[in-house]
Amino acid sequence: MKILLAYPTRSSFIARDIKILASKHVVSEHSYYSLAPADLLRGFLAVKSCDLLYLWFASIRALPLVLFARMLGKPVITVVGGYEAANCPEISYGNARKWQQRIPTRWILGLSQLILAVSRASSEAIIKNLKVAPQKVHLLYHGFEDFARDDNSVKVPVILTVGRADSSGWIRKGIREFFLAAEQMPEHSFVYVGGVDIDIPEILGRPMAPNITLVGAVPFETIGDYYGVAKVYLQASHHESFGCSVAEAMLYRCIPVVRDAYALPEVVGNTGVTFSGDSIAAVVQALTTALKMDAGEGERARLRVLNEFSYEKRKSDLLALIEKTRIA
């Protein structure tokens, strides 16, 4: 079968789905980010030549492709991310906050034959906030290959966070907590891996703590160098539909410290430390507890990802869902 996989940008988890689908089908790709006439035409031609449209994110930018696919009688499978179904006015986040934003998303999901959610938290948000029939929503966790199998790095008491530091993520992604916790824990090293698009000292109103190292963006192929040595991984997000970087860190035996928010507790389960509330004291206490845990906790975190969120599990289930949708 010919499958068109459409997305705004090609992230690592989208690349994994491309690899899975290409193992059994002919896969072509299209970025729907640009709505320029030439790009729209390329998208329409790609839809015309495919048998099924597999869409990552129910974005308004993808609506023309979905409408055209359904006009041609071709099935659509949509994977919903975090933003589309979120309704979080307290952090000014989510497509479901306003009816003007909800309508295009609901059109896309209404035209889709199958909707995939990457966590139970996401599934519940899709059903509740976007009024989607539960029978259309299928839970399919992200799947991770064991790329840390041969890692023998020696852990050091470093606290790591990975992600882009920008104005939209300062509160939502818990970047603020990373920098403020570092101020309260001067005896420990904090490492931030990812692009920095904001003036952090200006936001803080003071210089950055000297125990913080900003690495900058690194290729996915080398990020394991940082996961491998850090004992603790901090994800203080207020909203995550899953939290792929947390799972990747857990594969490298990092002990996860996460906020009790949306899908994060679902990912870490009973491993690591989960904190509640907005106080920096709670973050510091959670980090202190994690740093005192022995290496066995990191191994438990790794095994959780391998057992619950394996690449082979996602591959098997996704290919079966594709076949079921094709037959229907």
Show the residue positions of the predicted features:
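Short hydrophobic beta-strand element within catalytic cores of glycosyltransferases
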Residues: 255-258
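Conserved donor-binding/catalytic core segment of Leloir-type glycosyltransferases
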Residues: 151-185, 191
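A short, well-ordered alpha-helix in the C-terminal region of glycosyltransferases
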Residues: 295-308, 317
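Conserved acidic donor-binding segment of nucleotide-sugar-dependent glycosyltransferases
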Residues: 272-280, 288-294
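Nucleotide-activated donor-binding/catalytic signature segment of Leloir-type glycosyltransferases, i.e.
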Residues: 201-224
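Donor nucleotide-sugar binding/catalytic pocket of nucleotide-sugar-dependent glycosyltransferases
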Residues: 110-149, 158-164
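Membrane-proximal helix-turn-helix segments that form the acceptor-binding/catalytic region
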Residues: 96-115
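Aromatic "clamp/platform" in nucleotide-sugar-dependent glycosyltransferases that forms part
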Residues: 238
